[in-house]
Swiss-Prot record:
This is Protein sey1. GO terms for biological process: endoplasmic reticulum membrane fusion. Its main location: endoplasmic reticulum. Keywords: Coiled coil, Endoplasmic reticulum, GTP-binding, Hydrolase, Membrane, Nucleotide-binding, Transmembrane, Transmembrane helix. It comes from Botryotinia fuckeliana (strain B05.10).
Length: 886
């Protein structure tokens, strides 16, 4: 089993021989996620067994890739496999080189450690001293079971299958050999390399369309330096060439060279035990070669510029599909079928494209399905409605869905990807076509109904009043608007490249239906015009009236004061300014309304009614804005700003810095009284120039004779104008009732008092400072006591506990409650003491004689009464006690 101990005693190798970070009891990758296990997070952090010794593939490989954040890296990953004879230190090399934790062999019991194929992610991401020498991202390392082991004996079936699997998936094949094995056949793994060459012919030479390459990276261990690396390299190349020449190759490739399909790299490492420091240094240098690079002609770079990961080595399998691809390859290998990698890639592409298609359609369904359900429900109810932003939603959903599919699936087989994309687009377009057709039907019905009603009403009104109007202009204009609306909706549904989104025939049918409709359009247009003008008046009044109220009493940089510092107009003429602004705004609105109404060829009566309604509506807007400004919170804030401008700043607009010598009380009283005079001013809408109420009835005018009762339904009664409502002009112009005025005065005074108290505190705080020399004097006089406390453990610990208690109390904001409790307790204690003393004097004969007091009834001396205290610890008054009892 993969989790068995390396030796029967469960003991480690000697301290000299073992890897410094190895566990005390060495196991064969016991902490990895093995085949058949329920993997844990800790196991995934170390690695995973891809294939066990029974040739079973691990179905959790994709989960491991997701756990290591490799599955989403696309093509930005690299796969390395290591080959070599059993017990030659392959796992040890990988652990040092990539920071992995593969199980290593115990010298006490020379037996097989690695069974099957194991994988772990590189953990030495920063091997290089500089950024240019940093190892590549997402390096996956496969530790392949060693060859020539006594456990399998002459059974080379797994050896051949594992070599075939590694070659089909890996970019770099590391061959781990010892220096003294160079020149041997079995010792130098030439038998294994012959197997690699044979499976390479089986895999790639049959595919004449491409020439995949792989890198054979020879790591020569225990290199003493007596034989130069170049000589060892030449020997290995000669042996490899001889093996390649002896292979039986496909027709037409008999004269091919080994260099056409393989690149070679070489590295030498010193003895791990005899030269441990140098071994670690050379391994770190070797790690810097595992990064992206390209071919180089310079000999000193060993044929590579930058690193050994060349683009042509990559198998071009996206990381999220690697587990499926690897499992398919292994199934083919185990079943002893001819491994056809192009077919495997197509199968992988079909599987992944279908899977990706289902995933992206989930997002598409989330956006489109609610719209489909709404449209179906409206159709069943007989009231089809136009769904807002359907065109942009459909177009965006289609584009994003296809784009997401393209982003993930385009990395797979191009032919399969193109076919699956066409299928996906067909599914999307079928649903959008039905949805868009229903949208246009709803737009058609609602548009025709709206147009028909509008034109019919316009005709009836013209016939009733015998007024002249250009019906053709009205119909043409409304028709143009309706057509434009339909056209806009149709264009919003258009998708470039899709012929079925050209809705010209539906547009022609819609235009034909509009040509059959007539109605009374002008009145509707007049009402819409009135609404637009009223909205404009509301917008203008909201801004201008708000500015006037913001100027309220702000003598310098208040919220409404100009930036230049000039004082605004007097506070007394506030209502005059508001009335003038209101009249000017409405006059401008009347001009706009009249000009626009004449362009509709409206009658004088219609214009008169419209202007009459405009004035009444505008007054309602003004009253609503005034009521909003004098709401309790708003007006109180403005009064506070007015008070603070006068209290906190001098006549020149300079902020006051309070000192004890300042006449804070006088300034406060003056500012407060000045602000209080504003409240009566604000309570009634009265013009200061004439000292009278505005002539609202005269300004609005009498009700036009041609007014329609329907025109008065939405109008609010106005005091002094609509006398039948029983509300006078005086009541209409009252802004603040007497009760609100009194309440506002009380609230403002409380607010002003708070500002005053704050100013007094700031003035007192400026002088309540302890002189600095006092601290030096305190330190000098109390030095002996400080030393005594610090040297006495009891005092020192007590001091620390007091400090901790004080800090906790301060952090929890408990000082206030504690002080109030102490004050209350002390006050209560004094009262009880006085009461007991009074009882003693009354009960004592000498005390009575001295005080001339009458004896008291001893029957009432048993109880001690407790007084009711207020929040400050004072004795509460009798009235407060009675209220407390109620």
């Amino acid at each position: 089993m993969a989790t068995a101990n390396i030796n029967g005693h469960g003991e480690r190798p000697s301290a000299v021989a073992r890897f410094p970070t190895a566990p005390s009891v060495m196991t064969m990758n016991g902490n990895f996620a093995s085949v058949g296990d329920a993997p844990t997070k800790e196991q995934y952090e170390r690695g995973i067994q891809v294939i066990d010794e029974q040739k079973e593939f691990n179905p959790n490989l994709n989960t491991y890739l997701q756990f290591t954040d490799t599955a989403h890296s696309g093509f930005n990953y690299h796969l390395i496999s290591v080959f070599g004879s059993q017990s030659t230190g392959k796992s040890t090399l990988l652990n040092h080189l990539f920071g992995t934790q593969f199980g290593v062999m115990s010298e006490r019991e020379r037996r097989q450690t690695t069974k099957g194929i194991w994988m772990s992610k590189n953990k030495n991401q920063s091997s290089g001293a500089s950024e240019s020498e940093t190892m590549a991202d997402n390096i996956l390392v496969m530790d392949v079971e060693g060859t020539d082991g006594r456990e399998r004996g002459e059974d080379q079936d797994f050896e051949r299958k594992s070599a075939l699997f590694a070659l089909a998936t890996s970019e770099v094949l590391i061959v781990n050999i010892w220096e003294h094995q160079v020149g041997l056949y079995q010792g130098a793994n030439m038998g294994l390399l012959k197997t690699v060459f044979e499976v390479n012919c089986q895999l790639f030479l049959k595919d004449k369309q491409s020439t995949p390459r792989s890198l054979l990276f020879f790591v020569i261990r225990d290199h003493l330096g007596t034989t130069p690396l170049a000589n060892l390299k030449d020997t290995l190349i000669q042996d490899l060439t001889a093996i390649w020449t002896s292979l039986s190759k496909p027709a037409g490739l008999e004269n091919s060279k080994i260099e056409d399909y393989f690149d070679f790299a070489f590295a030498a490492l010193p003895h791990k035990i005899l030269q441990p420091d140098k071994f670690v240094t050379e391994v770190q240098k070797l790690g810097t070669r595992f990064r992206a690079g390209h071919k180089s002609t310079r000999a000193e770079d060993a044929g590579f510029e930058g690193g050994v990961f060349l683009p042509e080595y990559h198998r071009r399998i996206p990381a999220d599909g690697f587990s499926v691809y690897a499992e398919g390859v292994w199934d083919q290998i185990v079943s002893n079928k001819d491994l056809d990698l192009p077919t495997q890639q197509e199968l992988l592409a079909q599987f992944r494209c279908d899977e990706i298609s289902r995933e992206v359609l989930v997002s598409f369904d989330g956006k489109i399905q609610p719209l489909e359900e709404k449209q179906a429900e409206d159709t069943r109810s007989g009231k089809p409605t136009v769904i807002a932003d359907l065109g942009s939603t459909g177009k965006t959903s289609r584009t994003s869905t296809v784009k997401n599919f393209e982003t993930q699936a385009s990395r797979y087989h191009k032919g399969v990807y193109a076919l699956k994309r066409t299928e996906l687009e067909g599914k999307i377009d079928t649903r959008l076509k039905a949805l868009y057709h229903g949208q246009l039907v709803a737009a058609h019905k609602s548009g025709v109904a709206s147009f028909s009603d509008a034109v019919s009403n316009a005709v009836k009104l013209g016939q009733k009043r015998a007024a002249s109007y250009e019906f053709a202009d009205i119909v043409e204009r409304e028709k143009e608007t309706a057509l434009k609306t339909f056209e806009t909706e149709a264009k919003s549904l258009y998708i470039e490249g899709l012929a079925w989104t050209n809705f010209k025939s539906q547009y022609d049918l819609y235009e034909k239906d509009l040509n059959e409709v007539s109605g009374n359009l002008r009145k509707e247009e007049m009402r819409r015009l009135a609404t637009r003008v009223e909205r404009w008046v509301r917008s203008r009044l909201n801004d201008s009236i708000g500015v006037e109220f913001n100027k309220l009493g702000s003598g310098r940089g208040g919220s409404g004061a100009p930036e230049t510092g000039e004082k605004p107009a007097s506070e007394k003429d506030l209502w005059d300014r508001i009335w003038k602004t209101f009249v000017d705004t409405v006059k401008e609105a009347e001009s706009k309304f009249t000009d626009r109404a004449k362009s509709f060829d409206a009658s004088e009566d219609e214009i008169e009614v419209g202007l009459w309604r405009l004035k009444r509506k505008s007054w309602g807007v003004l009253r609503a804005k005034i009521d909003e400004e004098v709401m309790e919170g708003n007006i109180l804030l403005k009064l506070r700003e007015n008070f603070e401008d006068k209290f906190r700043y001098d006549e020149a607009g300079v902020p006051r810095i309070w000192r004890p010598s300042d006449d804070i009380e006088g300034i406060y009283t003056k500012a407060r009284e000045s602000t209080l005079t504003l409240i009566p001013l604000l309570s009634k809408f009265k013009l200061s120039e004439s000292s009278s109420l505005p002539e609202l009835s005269e300004w609005i005018g009498s009700t036009p004779a041609s007014v329609d009762p329907k025109d008065e339904e939405d109008l609010t009664p106005i005091g002094g104008v609509d006398e039948e409502e029983g509300k006078s002009l005086e009541e209409e112009m009252t802004v603040l009732s007497e009760a609100k005025r009194q309440d506002l005065v009380v609230r403002f005074k409380k607010t002003a008092d708070g500002v005053y108290v704050e100013a007094k505190r700031s003035a007192i705080g400026g002088v309540a400072q302890v002189p600095l020399y006092f601290y030096g004097l305190l330190l000098a006089l109390g030095w002996n006591e400080i030393v005594a406390v610090l040297r006495n453990p009891i005092y020192f610990i007590f001091l620390i506990l007091c400090g901790i208690a004080g800090y906790v109390t301060y952090t929890l904001n408990l000082w206030g409650p504690i002080i109030r409790m102490m004050n209350a307790a002390s006050t209560q204690g004094v009262e009880i003491g006085k009461e007991k003393l009074r009882e003693f004097l009354k009960d004592n004969e000498m005390g009575r004689q001295a005080l001339g007091m009458q004896g008291r009834d001893h029957g009432d001396s048993d109880g001690i009464s407790l007084n009711t205290l207020d929040s400050r610890g004072k004795r509460a008054s009798r009235e407060e006690e009675e209220e407390e009892e109620i």
